[in-house]
From Swiss-Prot:
The keyword Transcription regulation is assigned to this record: no
Subcellular localization: Secreted; Cytoplasm
Lineage, uppermost ranks: Eukaryota, Metazoa, Chordata, Craniata, Vertebrata
Catalytic class of the enzyme: oxidoreductase
Gene: LPO
Function: Heme-containing oxidoreductase which catalyzes the conversion of thiocyanate (SCN(-)) into antimicrobial agent hypothiocyanous acid (OSCN(-)) in the presence of hydrogen peroxide (H2O2). Also involved in the conversion of iodide (I(-)) into hypoiodite (IO(-)) in the presence of H2O2. Responsible for the inactivation of a wide range of micro-organisms and hence, important component of defense mechanism. Shows antibacterial properties against Pseudomonas aeruginosa.
The protein's name in its UniProt record: Lactoperoxidase
Protein transport as UniProt keyword: no
Entry-linked PROSITE patterns: PEROXIDASE_3
Main location class: secreted
Keywords assigned by UniProt, alphabetized: Antimicrobial, Calcium, Cytoplasm, Disulfide bond, Glycoprotein, Heme, Hydrogen peroxide, Iron, Metal-binding, Nitration, Oxidoreductase, Peroxidase, Phosphoprotein, Secreted, Signal
Length: 712
């Protein structure tokens, strides 16, 4: 009788035990399914990465690389960036396979167990890749540990920040324009190349130069951009065939999103049906997995820290140093010099695309903190100046502090050079970029706040591409009297991509630096946006007659990144959102441009953010429109206020050191690191020689005496 009384409880316990066992079996089955699926995905993705590396090596050995192969050389992921992108691709491929299995077998969707999936892939929650020393006076190379509360905030190889949610065709990863016939807000999207042809292109180069901004103004923008963001491409497919499908046959699929040519496009006659386009690298989503939409990677630190000099990758940062010397120096070229002054070291990895630009000279690409250093000769020139300045600072600090070891000298010189980039950007560059909107978006510095998010936003990577419209069609080299230098003083822009030989074998950097100081940038004009040198001849090899279209690439990249449209960003910035032709005309102050845009897009809501932003008229005394002023200003304010090592933050430098730092200038950088003796006082403004130039003796020097150790 007593047993019967306890029978219900026993039965209930038995049921619970059976349920628990069933749950455990289901969990084990699910975990096993995830493990098997991830293993299969890893095999596929790893093969794609291996194939890509082999393919690139073979292409560079051919001595006749194509535009695509030159671009791939620049956008090829390395080191920890490569690992992060590989994990992102494995995660997305695994999730796709698991969802397919779930729908086929009608079982509970295993993708709900996203934590297990992330751990199996190797993602995990973002954590610092270095041990944080809260008392260290120096930044880490990776950007970790800047924010003590969230040590990974702003670090390299994390997702770009979203200020507005991503907008993909399928809500997850497919870009708008992917599926033929599918509309956005009721209208089909125009081809990216068609937008470039009808909105961005122009024929006549007359009257395009900016009468108030020097060529250095354009070049500084590129330097800053390469300090802040870089998203290498994904790896495509797992076979040579899939690569050929994208590269040669324009077959869309996987991470291939070719830029198709519209009917009667002049490029169609020489380049076939399309320009190949590979989608940007992305990372695993992070807990709590509120969104599974694809998030593109930023391979660099988000901080304005001169990472283009020192790298955001620890292994490369070490490789860039001269560790055989106790002076804290950066490594320099051991094979050639610029009239006794150092060049960047050559990249020892062979083969090098720069060698094939001139197969007689065969000058390799340079090795620098940013992989894009040899992309263009003026960029390589800028990198060279910063390399020399680091070594100059390190030697001078050693003279003041003989007891300092190489590590201390390296870190102190790096810290000063980082402050230099911050000061020039905020004191000299941004005020004449943002004009009257500077104070609105970047108020005076009030100190560091760990609650400010310093991460580079996804939209900023498009906003900062306004600089592509400031690039003129040719570059000039000038002699000591700022007159044309040598038999070829003017060089078409497209001949200077990967062109290291022009520097090493044909005059050094001084003639190029003088061109930066005395020649003008191109002016952003609504009817003359981007020079044909970039719109038709980007990365055009010397042995070929065609190149890429940078405007079409920028437009396609907006869609690849899932960028919301023009009006979404206007609303974000508290600006009006035009809906009609009249309203768009009011914003753009150009009925012709408004008509063209509506004819292509159907609605202002669909205008790609890069196109809409560059179409706006310039703000007073600035060089961008209101929307760009908002996006750029907001980003730079966050970069500054969310950086614990910002040069003005109390405790980073002493008051005496800060007083010295404020005397730094780009003109002094030139005086100290070239043979140039005459420079302008305001090098970002358009200057005429000799009226606006002074002797280097009239330019303030950086006084390093406040860095002298008390012990000395």
């Amino acid at each position: 009788m007593r047993v019967l009384l306890h029978l219900p409880a026993l039965l209930a316990s038995l049921i619970l035990l059976q349920a628990a066992a069933s749950t455990t079996r289901a969990q084990t089955t699910r975990t096993s399914a995830i493990s098997d699926t991830v293993s299969q995905a890893k095999v596929q993705v790893n093969k794609a990465f291996l194939d890509s590396r082999t393919r690139l090596k073979t292409a560079m050995s051919s001595e006749t690389p194509t535009s695509r192969q030159l671009s791939e050389y620049l956008k090829h992921a390395k080191g920890r960036t490569r690992t992060a992108i590989r994990n992102g691709q494995v995660w997305e491929e695994s999730l796709k396979r698991l969802r397919q299995k779930a729908s086929l077998t009608n079982v509970t969707d295993p993708s709900l167990d996203l934590t297990s999936l992330s751990l199996e892939v190797g993602c995990g929650a973002p954590a610092p890749v270095v041990r944080c020393d809260p008392c260290s006076p120096y930044r880490t190379i990776t950007g970790d540990c800047n924010n003590r509360r969230k040590p990974a905030l702003g670090a390299a190889n994390r997702a770009l920040a979203r200020w507005l949610p991503a907008e993909y065709e399928d809500g997850l990863s497919l870009p708008f324009g992917w599926t033929p016939g599918k509309t956005r807000n009721g209208f089909p999207l125009p081809l990216a190349r068609e937008v470039s042809n009808k909105i961005v292109g122009y024929l006549n180069e007359e009257g395009v130069l900016d009468q108030n901004r020097s060529l250095l103004f354009m070049q500084w923008g590129q330097i800053v951009d390469h300090d802040l963001d870089f998203a290498p491409d994904t790896e495509l497919g797992s076979s040579e065939y899939s690569k050929a499908q994208c590269d040669e046959y324009c077959i869309q699929g996987d991470n291939c999103f070719p830029i198709m040519f519209p009917p009667n496009d002049p490029k169609a006659g020489t380049q076939g049906k399309c320009m190949p386009f590979f989608r940007a690298g992305f990372v695993c989503p992070t807990p709590p997995y509120k969104s599974l939409a694809r998030e593109q990677i930023n391979a660099l630190t988000s901080f304005l820290d001169a990472s283009f000099v020192y790298s955001s990758e620890p292994s490369l940062a070490s490789r860039l140093r001269n560790l055989s010397s106790p002076l804290g120096l950066m490594a320099v070229n051991q094979e050639v010099s610029d009239h006794g002054l150092p060049y960047l070291p050559y990249d020892s990895k062979k083969p090098s695309p720069c060698e094939f630009i001139n197969t007689t000279a065969r000058v390799p690409c340079f090795l620098a903190g940013d992989s894009r250093a040899s992309e263009h000769i003026l960029l390589a020139t800028s990198h060279t100046l910063f390399l020399r300045e680091h070594n100059r600072l390190a030697r001078e600090l050693k003279r003041l502090n003989p007891q300092w070891d190489g590590e201390k000298l390296y870190q102190e010189a790096r810290k000063i050079l980082g402050a230099f980039v911050q000061i020039i950007t905020f004191r000299d560059y941004l005020p004449i970029l943002l004009g009257d909107h500077m104070q609105k978006w970047i108020p005076p510095y009030q100190g560091y706040s760990e609650s400010v998010d310093p991460r580079i936003s996804n939209v900023f990577t498009f906003a900062f591409r306004f600089g592509h419209l400031e690039v003129p069609s040719s570059m000039f080299r000038l002699d000591e009297n700022y007159q044309p230098w040598g038999p070829e003083p003017e060089l078409p822009l497209h001949t200077l991509f990967f062109n290291t030989w022009r520097m090493v074998k044909d005059g050094g950097i001084d003639p190029l630096v003088r061109g930066l100081l005395a020649k003008k940038s191109k002016l952003m004009k609504q009817n003359k946006m981007m020079t044909g040198e970039l719109r038709n001849k980007l990365f055009q090899p010397t042995h070929r007659i065609h190149g890429f279209d940078l405007a079409a690439i920028n437009t396609q990249r907006c869609r690849d990144h899932g960028q919301p449209g023009y009006n979404s960003w206007r609303a974000f910035c508290d600006l009006s959102q035009p809906q009609t032709l009249e309203e768009l005309n009011t914003v753009l102050k150009s009925k012709m441009l408004a008509k063209k845009l509506l004819g292509l897009y159907g609605t202002p809501d669909n205008i790609d953010i890069w196109i809409g932003a560059i179409a706006e008229p310039l703000v007073e005394r600035g060089r961008v429109g209101p929307l760009l002023a908002c996006l750029l200003g907001k980003q730079f304010q966050q970069i500054r206020d969310g950086d614990r090592f910002w040069w003005e933050n109390p405790g980073v430098f002493t008051n005496e050191q800060k007083d010295s730092l404020q005397k730094m200038s780009f003109s002094r950088l030139v005086c100290d690191n070239t043979r140039i003796t005459k420079v302008p006082r305001d090098p970002f403004w358009a200057n005429s020689y000799p009226y606006d130039f002074v002797d280097c003796s009239a330019i303030d020097k950086l006084d390093l005496s406040p860095w002298a150790s008390v012990k000395n």
